[in-house]
């Protein structure tokens, strides 16, 4: 990876005619440290927002220990730099194979779901594991949003209560 002291130096040397992907590690470290100091909870980075290996490595170096992953490939990306990082498989539609691989090969115990079918799939793919941490995504009203995604993500209110009851029977937390 080429390194430049500034964007101006990059432009002068490369004279790019296409977009250039730049990583400012010091900015990532600074933002991560600031957020971790100010946020009272646990910080979980969504790998899909920037799956670049240098970004993940820099975040781990800054002390981020938890990652929201949406695929086995994202789990591998995190584990390449930290075997102890906690990965939470938060994609709500996963294949049985990816659930099984995540659980049995990588030790992933945290999964998100928003349907009974997804819960059944998780239970079958983990051999009805007793050490799971399951999250139910609930759809909330987005009536004032520019783009209403409330019908795309999460269990609707009328189904969520029953789903919570089912999850409670199978979840560690």
Give the positions of each predicted feature.
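Conserved anion-binding
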Residues: 105, 114-173
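A charged N-terminal "starter" segment
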Residues: 1-111, 116-132, 169
């Amino acid at each position: 990876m080429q390194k430049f002291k500034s964007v101006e130096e990059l432009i002068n040397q490369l004279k790019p005619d296409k977009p250039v992907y730049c990583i400012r590690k010091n900015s990532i470290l600074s933002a991560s440290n600031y957020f971790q100091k100010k946020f009272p909870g646990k910080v979980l980075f969504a790998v899909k927002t920037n799956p670049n290996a240098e970004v993940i490595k820099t975040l781990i170096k800054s002390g981020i220990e938890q990652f929201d992953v949406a695929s086995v490939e994202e789990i591998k990306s995190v584990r390449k730099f930290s075997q102890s990082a906690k990965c939470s498989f938060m994609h709500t539609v996963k294949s049985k194979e990816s659930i099984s691989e995540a659980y049995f090969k990588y030790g992933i115990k945290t999964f998100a779901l928003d349907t009974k079918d997804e819960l059944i799939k998780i239970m079958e793919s983990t051999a009805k594991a007793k050490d799971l941490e399951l999250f139910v995504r609930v759809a909330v009203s987005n009536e004032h949003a520019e783009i209403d995604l409330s019908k795309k993500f999460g269990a609707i209110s009328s189904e969520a209560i029953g789903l919570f009851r089912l999850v409670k029977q199978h979840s560690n937390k």
